[in-house]
């Protein structure tokens, strides 16, 4: 009886809608689970008894899951007989490190469940219907997930998952690579590998820069069209402004043309004036005496 109690842990403060499979996902990473006795009362919270094959696995589970934040519920994990000596020792030895099997209450409260970490994996081959919550539920089988994200690009649906410690990340790489991913709409096999900041961080940035370049090119085309429309709208004004000085210039040489117009007249008059003056003087002088002389010659014989 005592040996079994040393292999069984009590898990308290569970959500009211938790399932037995989720409890197994929480504790299977610490060792083979023999039995799970889940109790979900009408009024939450729920609780469960998890029996391991080895007492050392139970100790590891207490170290890793006591104080763990599961969907906003702070789990309470201790030996099934009620002793909390191991979990108290856990708080004293694991809170400061941050890379232990789990998080203590103080550490979990300060970090929160959605804090980013450097222990990151990349998940490819996700169905298009996958959400960040679906990804988080699937990757919990490998360890403590503190962040999950799903984004879509030309290559398909990809996920990024952060674990709270290095051991969980390594375990997830071994256990969850090339495994079946399922949600309420579809399923498929996913590949899991360690996240490479140099190679993997470029793809989202490229997509973002591509969208920005589109917006910039559109903005430029609009600005060009606007500038063209403005230049076109201004062109009549420019023409009018150009015409106005043209009119002024046409008006200003107007008198010049008038002054020029009489100049040929003057030249003509000058050219004509001497000619008729000579002709008039020559023609008029003989013409006038001719009729005067003619009657004289006619009258003289009459007399």
UniProtKB/Swiss-Prot annotation:
Q: Where is the RRM domain?
A: 7-82, 119-197
**Ranges annotated as biased composition (Basic residues):** 209-245, 257-271
Residue spans of biased composition, Basic and acidic residues class = 81-91
A single MF term (Gene Ontology) = mRNA binding
Q: In which tissues is it expressed?
A: Ubiquitous.
Q: Which GO terms describe its cellular component?
A: interchromatin granule; nuclear speck; nucleus; spliceosomal complex
* Stretches for region Disordered: 81-116, 195-303
Localization annotation: Nucleus speckle; Nucleus, Nucleoplasm
Q: Which residues form a coiled coil?
A: none
Q: Give any Pfam family that matches.
A: RRM_1
Which terms does the UniProt entry file under GO BP?
mRNA processing; RNA splicing
Q: Where is the composition biased (Low complexity)?
A: 246-256, 284-295
Gene3D superfamilies this protein is in? 3.30.70.330
Ordered alphabetically, the record's keywords are: mRNA processing, mRNA splicing, Nucleus, Phosphoprotein, Repeat, RNA-binding, Spliceosome
Q: Which CDD domains match?
A: RRM1_SF2_plant_like (cd12599), RRM2_SF2_plant_like (cd12602)
Q: What does this protein do?
A: General splicing factor. Can promote splice site selection in vitro presumably by antagonizing the effects of the A1 heterogeneous nuclear ribonucleoprotein. May have an essential function during early plant development.
Protein family according to the UniProt entry: Belongs to the splicing factor SR family. SR subfamily.
Query: Extra info from the record?
Result: The splicing pattern of the pre-mRNA is regulated in a tissue-specific manner and by development, and changes in response to various types of abiotic stresses and hormones.
Protein name as it appears in the record:
Serine/arginine-rich-splicing factor SR34
Q: Please tell me the species this chain comes from.
A: Arabidopsis thaliana (Mouse-ear cress)
Name of the encoding gene? SR34
């Amino acid at each position: 009886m005592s040996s079994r109690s040393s292999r069984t842990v009590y898990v308290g403060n569970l959500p009211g809608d938790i399932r037995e499979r989720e409890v197994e996902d929480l504790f299977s990473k610490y060792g083979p689970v023999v039995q799970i006795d889940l109790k979900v009362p009408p009024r939450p919270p729920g609780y469960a008894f998890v029996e391991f094959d080895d007492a050392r696995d139970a100790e590891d589970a207490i170290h890793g899951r006591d104080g763990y934040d599961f969907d906003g519920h702070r789990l309470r994990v201790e030996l099934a007989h009620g002793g909390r000596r191991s979990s108290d020792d856990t708080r004293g030895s694991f809170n400061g490190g941050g890379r232990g099997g789990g998080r203590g209450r103080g550490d979990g409260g300060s970090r929160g469940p959605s804090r980013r970490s450097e222990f990151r994996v990349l998940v490819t081959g996700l169905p298009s219907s996958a959400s960040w919550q679906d990804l988080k539920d699937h990757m919990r089988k490998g360890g403590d997930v503190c962040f999950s994200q799903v984004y879509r690009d030309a290559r398909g649906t990809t996920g990024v998952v952060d674990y709270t410690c290095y051991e969980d990340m390594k375990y997830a790489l071994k256990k969850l690579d090339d495994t079946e991913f399922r949600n309420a709409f579809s399923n498929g096999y996913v590949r899991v590998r360690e996240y490479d900041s140099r190679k993997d961080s470029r793809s989202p940035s490229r997509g973002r820069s591509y969208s920005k370049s589109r917006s910039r090119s559109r903005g430029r085309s609009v600005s060009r069209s606007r500038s063209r429309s403005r230049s076109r709208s201004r062109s009549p004004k420019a023409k009018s402004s150009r015409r106005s000085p043209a009119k002024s210039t046409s008006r200003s040489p107007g008198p010049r043309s008038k002054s020029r117009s009489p100049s040929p007249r003057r030249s003509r008059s000058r050219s004509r004036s001497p000619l008729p003056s000579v002709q008039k003087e020559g023609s008029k002088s003989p013409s006038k005496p001719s009729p005067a002389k003619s009657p004289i010659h006619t009258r003289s014989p009459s007399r």
